[in-house]
Amino acid sequence: MMADVAALAAGAIRFASGVSFLVDPARADRWWGARKTPDATAQLLWRSMGYRDALIGGLLLAAALRGTNTRGWFLASGGADAADLLGGMAVHDQLPRSQQVVGLGGAVVGIGVGLWGATRRRRPAEKT
């Protein structure tokens, strides 16, 4: 069985990102461009995104390691980023430029990766 390297990479990145949001939401907030310590509501939202991303990333990673179909998990990953983009667009004019670029730009890239992963053709594994 040949490993799905793209699913391994995408799953590992989303899983690690989610865990980092859970472990240190203040650092995640700064990394995404915030200039001050996040309040309790922002920390709750970072942790909620962390649970979501760790779950989706972990399940994408697990499917890749098992050699099972990863399309649905790629689609879930892209859907999570689409929700982030939609929410971000509602406050786009209130975000500093750094958050517009990193947060919304990252969501656009994530949507693209999710759609690519869900629709790509995979060669059947060679029999040995």
PLM features per residue range, with description:
Residues 1-128:
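Short amphipathic, positively biased membrane-proximal segments
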